[in-house]
Amino acid sequence: MSEEVIRFPGARRPDRTRRVDAYGVGIAVYEWGAPDARPLLLAHGGFDFAGTFDGFAPLLADGGWRVVSWDHRGHGDSDHAALYSWQADLRDALLVMDSVGHEPMPIVGHSKG
């Protein structure tokens, strides 16, 4: 029996990946587009991960944005943690934002994001 692989047309894995230390919890961060372009953050919803943006982020990157997303703690390639709370999620988001720059940047989210 052959295995059929179905891909979303236009989907593209990130151009760069890295990790941010959130007080001992490793947060996986993904970027599409030019590193010197204006940043735009994408926040995924609950029970999801940043890979959900593999179809949408490249379109934004092709439009001139540096698209940055991250796997929330306990999701995707980010570490699991002893603490899960809205406060922890917000601290993690702020650490990711600080790792990108200190200028105001748009954030797009869905569901919990």
Enumerate the predicted regions with their spans.
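Conserved HGGG/HGGXW glycine-rich cap/lid loop of the alpha/beta-hydrolase fold
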Residues: 28-77
